[in-house]
Design a protein with these regions (language model features):
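Helix-loop boundary and gating motifs at the non-cytosolic
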Residues: 4-40
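Helix-to-coil boundary motifs at intracellular loop junctions of multi-pass secondary transporters
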Residues: 33-34, 65, 116-121
Length: 122
């Protein structure tokens, strides 16, 4: 059992899940600062959730055929980059694109992370 790799995978999982859960916490600031409607704010949450939910089984099929450990750092990066760029623009369509990108990052991480955790945990 490789405790170092288990710790790294656990930390990576924490980071990706925090990214997915951070959007609802950020929304009140976006609503107040940019006068978003509740519908527009909810659409951002929907985009993040749906992109993750639709893409994750596809990434699972892709990584089941052959190990793709590079999906783990790419997924963590995309999840973080997607949400961190929310503050760089005030255009709604860019927010929608970045939260969708974040959802795809979360989706890319999970299947390969589960496979690798099973491998390193024995």
């Amino acid at each position: 059992m490789n405790y170092r790799n288990i710790g790294l995978l656990t930390a990576s999982h924490l980071v990706t899940d925090i990214n997915q859960g951070a959007l609802p916490a950020i929304l009140p600031f976006l609503i107040a600062e940019h006068h978003l409607s509740y519908q527009a704010a909810a659409s951002l949450v929907f985009a993040l959730s749906m992109s993750s939910s639709i893409a994750q089984p596809l990434f699972g099929l892709y990584s089941d055929r052959m190990s793709k450990p590079w999906l783990i750092p790419i997924g963590v990066f995309l999840a973080g980059a997607g949400l961190s760029t929310l503050g760089l623009t005030s255009k709604y369509w860019l927010w929608f694109a970045t939260v969708t990108l974040s959802g795809i990052g979360v989706a890319a991480f999970h299947p390969e992370g589960a496979r690798l955790m099973n491998f390193v945990a024995g």
